[in-house]
């Protein structure tokens, strides 16, 4: 049995803000008769997936676009965030008249399994024990996230998605969708991502995880029950990760060596420089909306991601015979997922016989460029979806 209901807040007990008035998140609950099979061998049941929708599904159910969020994102793509009150994380791209036009497409975005904004994760309650899962929650993978999304799409009565779109960890999910469900994805827009996590990126994630686990308030993952939260460790993890989302040029342009509210150094360990103050703010604000254990689980899921590993190490074999149309996007200053990674994906798609276009966008805004106001990226996304829509026969009146 599958139940769908509204939710009024995220899973983490520290987060008490009310959900935005419009649109309200929905949550699909899957009971014990519909378990989620995980790569670790566990059948997770019951579980729930929180999601948002924007726009209307057409009568043919042919205009649905699934957006897959990145590591620290959630389902609140284009509405005010219920915890922070800030605009949706992709409000630049999603909305009426925008590339992902909500007056033409039916947009879906779900919080990934293992997340902390309504979907089942380590901050949820284990129904067998009545306790918060904590580290008893099973380790999850990108394929697990996609299986859960597919179950949600089934619940919504949608057979084929017009497009699957996402950047970073979201882009990994896009690629996994195309491998696991090739007949269900008409077009795909993977952005600033790769088909496997690099050693460098695994190293950065391990740094963040160790920062969390070294915080005395982490309490071996049982901090919720003990009324604590590893704010310092999670804040440091966020600061370190955030540096990888930027670029040297962007940091120089935005901050340089400028002082923060002073003309001379204090000769102390206060935040003398603007860039220090900025990073501290990134860390302190992040801990107010994200669960520390979820951070551990989701970074580990990214680390395990390797599409070729399930195809005898031959990446092209994963895409062989696919009919999905692809547009792969990278950014010149992205050193977290450099253009070479995207080119390798494109080469594999070509070798597999896929229809694929590739765009490398010149910008100094680093990995986070896909979340920012980059007109060239908007133009490419719009043109790709327009072309795919014409190929599929999506007339304006039908969208």
UniProtKB/Swiss-Prot annotation:
Question: Which UniProt keywords are given for this protein, alphabetically ordered?
Answer: Acyltransferase, Amino-acid biosynthesis, Cytoplasm, Methionine biosynthesis, Transferase
Query: Which compartment or compartments is the protein found in?
Result: Cytoplasm
Q: Which source organism does the UniProt entry give?
A: Nitrobacter winogradskyi (strain ATCC 25391 / DSM 10237 / CIP 104748 / NCIMB 11846 / Nb-255)
Q: Which GO terms describe its biological process?
A: homoserine metabolic process; methionine biosynthetic process
Which superkingdom is the protein from? Bacteria
Q: Which GO terms describe its molecular function?
A: homoserine O-acetyltransferase activity
Tell me which family the UniProt entry assigns to this protein. Belongs to the AB hydrolase superfamily. MetX family.
Q: What protein name does the entry list? A: Homoserine O-acetyltransferase
The gene it comes from is metXA
Q: Which residues form a coiled coil?
A: none
């Amino acid at each position: 049995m599958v139940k769908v209901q509204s939710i009024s807040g995220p899973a983490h007990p520290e987060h008490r803000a009310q959900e935005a008035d419009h649109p309200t998140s929905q949550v699909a609950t899957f009971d014990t008769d519909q378990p989620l099979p995980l790569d670790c061998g566990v059948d997770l049941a019951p579980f729930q997936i929180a999601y948002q929708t924007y726009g209307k599904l057409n009568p043919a159910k042919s205009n649905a676009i699934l957006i897959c969020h990145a590591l620290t994102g959630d389902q609140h793509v284009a509405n005010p965030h219920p915890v922070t009150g800030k605009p949706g994380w992709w409000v630049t791209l999603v909305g009426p008249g925008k590339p992902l036009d909500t007056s033409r497409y039916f947009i879906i975005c779900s919080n990934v399994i293992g997340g902390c904004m309504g979907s089942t994760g380590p901050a949820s309650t284990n129904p067998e024990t009545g306790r918060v899962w904590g580290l008893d929650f099973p380790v999850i993978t990108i394929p697990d996230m996609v299986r859960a999304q597919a179950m949600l799409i089934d619940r919504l009565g949608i057979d084929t998605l017009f497009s699957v779109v996402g950047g970073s960890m979201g882009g990994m999910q896009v690629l996994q969708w195309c491998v696991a469900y090739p007949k269900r994805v008409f077009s795909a827009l993977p952005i600033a991502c790769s088909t496997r996590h690099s050693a460098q990126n695994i190293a950065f994630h391990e740094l963040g995880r160790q920062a969390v686990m070294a915080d005395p308030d982490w309490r071996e993952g049982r901090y919720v029950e003990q009324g604590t939260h590893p704010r310092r460790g999670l804040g440091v993890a966020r600061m370190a990760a955030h540096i990888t989302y930027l670029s040297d040029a962007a940091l120089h342009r935005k901050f340089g060596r400028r002082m923060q509210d002073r003309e001379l150094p204090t000769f102390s360990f206060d935040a003398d420089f603007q860039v220090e103050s900025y990073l501290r703010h990134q860390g302190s604000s992040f801990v107010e909306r994200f669960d520390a254990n979820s951070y551990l689980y989701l970074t580990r899921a990214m680390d395990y991601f390797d599409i070729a590993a399930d195809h005898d190490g031959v990446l092209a074999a994963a895409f062989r015979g696919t009919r999905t149309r692809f547009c792969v996007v990278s950014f010149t200053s992205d050193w977290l997922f450099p253009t070479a990674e995207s080119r390798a994906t494109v080469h594999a798609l070509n070798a597999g016989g896929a229809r694929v276009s590739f765009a490398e966008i010149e910008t100094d805004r680093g990995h986070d460029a896909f979340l920012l106001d980059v007109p060239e990226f908007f133009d490419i996304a719009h043109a790709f979806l327009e072309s795919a829509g014409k190929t599929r026969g999506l007339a304006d009146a039908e969208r």
